[in-house]
Structures are given as C-alpha cells and as structure tokens.
C-alpha cells in the first residue's frame, strides 16, 4: 500500500475513529493527522519514513498513537504541532541511519538527524512507555506545556530530553535516559551534546523524579534564564563522562524560586575521557554562583544526595573525579554504615540526617572482603529504599585481621577509591 492510499484512508475516517494497520511493513511514509483518531496495530506494524522528513505530523487534538514501530529516515519520528491531548504510547521510535556513519554517530563526530518526538506548542501531551533512539533529540519541547514523559527508554540520542523555549509544566518520571551520545573524546570540555536532560532555554515547573540517567556525556544540564519550580528528586544519575549535574553560566532563577535537588544518587560520574574531569555536580564559574567559590553565602545550595562517598570532598587542583563536589556548591552527603546481622552477613544503611534515606533510588555499591589479598571477595550490592544486605563466604575469612572495604565503583578500567573501612571483630567471622 502506498503512502497516498494510507493518507486517503486516514482522511476518510470519521473523527474519534480508528485506523488499525494490518500489514507488517509500510515504506516511504509521511502522514498528516488532521482529525481526532487512533493510530494503532495488533501485528507489530513498522512505518518506515520518507527521507528527510517526519513519519507522523499530528495537527489535530485528541490523537492516540500506540503499538507501532516508527522509523524516521534521516528525519523525525512524530511531530506534535500546536494541538492538545495527544497520547503517544507503547511505540518503538527509531531512526534509519546510514550504516557507514555509525561509528561517527556513536563517537559524536557526526551529529544525529531529526527528532524522535517533537512537541511544538502542544498542550497536555502524554509520552509513555516508548523506546526512542538515534535522533538528535529523543524528545524535544518547544512551547510545550503540561507534558507527561513517563516509563520511556530514551537512548543513543544527542539529547535525551531537550527543552527549547517556552516549555513549562513538565513531568519526567520513571524513564531510562541512558547512553546519549556526546563528544566522548579529548576534544570537548563540556558538550554541547550528549546530555540526558538539557534545560538549555527553559526551566519552568519541571519535575524530574525516579529516573535512571546513566552513561550519558552529561546527566542533567540546566542553563536557562528565569527558572522556577525545578524539582530533581529520587533519580539515579551515574557514569557520566563529565558531571552528573551542571548548573551552567546562563542559569538564573525567578524571584523566590528555589532549585530543589535532593534524595538523588549522583555518583560515579566524571569517568572520562574528557579534556577536563571535574566531579559529580558543578556550577559554572561564569554564572551567578561563581563568587560562591570564595563566599559560602553565595554558593548554590543543593539538598542531601548520595555522591558515592562518605567524606565531603571539594574538587581542587589535586582532587577531581568521582565523589568530589564543585567548590561553588554547598550540599549535604547521604552517607552509609554497615552493621553485622549474623557472622558473615551484613546490612548497609544509608542515612539522611540520621534517618534511613528511604527516598533514595535503587543504587549500586560494592563491598570487598580482604581487598588485594588471595582471599579477596567482591560483592555487588543494590540498595533499595536506602538499605540492602550482603554476605561473604566463610572460606575467604582469615582467622583474624579481616577488613571489609566499601567502593562506589569497582571497575578494572577505572580508579578505585576506598570510601568505607570496617574492621571485622572475631565474633563476626563465620565458622
């Protein structure tokens, strides 16, 4: 079936009707949706886009797009254009790329084309449970208001979610925003690509909660003027090439506004390679918090977070990398402690101001018994709601002088740093 035939079918369906694709694959597709309808499939239909344009252009209110494979062809997947009440759910939204350029795309040498989902002056849009990859923007907001972005996997784009001008009232919840592609080389200091979430041109009433924002060039980037109502809580932000979170030089806030960043696990960032490696979070020295490096009252104030360390360390000339904090920021550490449950078995508990840090996201840490000896044993621990249990094999204990050490990262390709040491009493050695 040709594009024109499909367009004619869509145009002939009454408002509030449905178009169900029955075929497996349709090629050279670029469709305009000008009435309130449902587009769906029960047979895993693939719509391969026309070269250098959109696959679907939604120009009517109350449109539902679900259960489709939507492949842009060096262009965009779905454009939502000046309408309201659009729902985009349970789709795979990919980009058909020139395979000869894949190495350049993955390294960031060549920028990716198109937008997976472009929200242009839209209102009340729901984007849920989609897989979006290999676009310049996974999700792009320009003039979009009251947008819900939940339960998506957004990966291998130049920007996972990007805020352009006049976007507001956005919920970004429970997404996997991972491996978004920047200049992962020694060429660039910071960006301008590869950000998990980029609030470059607007940041008004944005809630970022319970997401996994991992393995991006940078995790979260805030650079907009006159920001207000930004809340970043309960996220795992880890393994970024440079910082996990940056407040950049153009950032300003509206009168009375407070940037809330708390109960996140922001750790194991600044992994490189990059021209400059800093730490977990940063405030640009040329921005409004620049003087905070020398005046504590002028620092950016962040709430308590897990930074992959039990010791507050400000980065400096001789101290950068994972676990370090920008000197223009004041924050509070969420540390952990371990206690013995029974011989050989332990519980790790993270604490926020003396109470269990139950609002933390799930996070990974490591404990090593008798590190760097012939009885070394490594356990990977995933903490849930601020707690986890772990145990070591009895055969790896010495009769005396056993030590448990904690590491935020235990990767042969990354430097290791002990963040916790526990001398095991003889009463805790399993028999």
Residue ranges with predicted function:
Residues 350-385:
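Short flexible loop/turn segments that cap and initiate beta-strands
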């Amino acid at each position: 079936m040709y594009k024109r035939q499909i367009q004619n079918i869509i145009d002939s369906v009454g408002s509030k009707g449905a178009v169900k694709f029955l075929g497996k694959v349709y090629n050279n597709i670029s469709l305009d949706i000008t009435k309130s309808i449902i587009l769906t499939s029960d047979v895993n239909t693939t719509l391969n886009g026309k070269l250098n344009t959109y696959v679907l252009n939604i120009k009517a209110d109350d449109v539902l797009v679900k259960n489709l494979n939507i492949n842009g062809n060096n262009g965009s997947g779905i454009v939502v254009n000046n309408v309201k009440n659009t729902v985009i759910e349970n789709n795979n939204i990919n980009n058909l790329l020139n395979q000869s350029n894949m190495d350049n795309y993955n390294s960031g040498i060549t920028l990716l084309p198109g937008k997976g989902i472009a929200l242009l002056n839209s209102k009340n849009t729901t984007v849920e449970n989609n897989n979006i990859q290999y676009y310049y923007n996974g999700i792009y907001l320009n003039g979009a208001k009251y947008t819900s972005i939940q339960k998506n996997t957004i990966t291998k784009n130049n920007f996972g979610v990007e805020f352009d001008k006049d976007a507001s009232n956005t919920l970004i919840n429970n997404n996997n925003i991972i491996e978004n592609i920047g200049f992962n080389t020694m060429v660039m200091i910071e960006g301008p690509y590869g950000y998990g979430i980029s609030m470059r041109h607007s940041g008004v009433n944005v809630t970022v909660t319970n997401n996994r924002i991992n393995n991006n060039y940078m995790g979260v980037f805030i650079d907009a003027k006159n920001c207000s109502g930004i809340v970043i809580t309960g996220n795992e932000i880890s393994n970024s090439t440079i910082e996990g979170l940056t407040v950049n030089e153009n950032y300003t806030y509206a009168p009375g506004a407070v940037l809330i960043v708390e109960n996140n696990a922001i750790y194991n960032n600044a992994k490189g390679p990059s021209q400059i490696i800093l730490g977990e979070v940063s405030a640009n020295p040329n921005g409004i918090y620049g003087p905070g490096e020398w005046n504590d009252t002028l620092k950016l104030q962040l709430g308590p977070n897990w930074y992959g360390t039990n010791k507050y360390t400000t980065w400096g000339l001789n101290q950068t990398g994972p676990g370090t904090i920008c000197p223009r920021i004041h924050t509070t550490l969420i540390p952990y402690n371990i206690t013995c449950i029974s011989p050989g078995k332990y519980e790790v508990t993270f604490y926020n101001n003396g109470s269990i840090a139950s609002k933390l996201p799930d996070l990974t840490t490591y404990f090593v018994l008798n590190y760097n000896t012939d009885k070394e044993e490594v356990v990977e621990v995933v903490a849930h709601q601020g707690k986890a249990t772990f145990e070591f094999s009895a055969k790896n204990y010495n009769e005396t002088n056993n030590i448990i050490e904690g590491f935020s990262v235990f990767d042969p390709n990354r430097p290791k740093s002990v963040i916790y040491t526990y001398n095991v009493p003889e009463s805790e050695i399993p028999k």
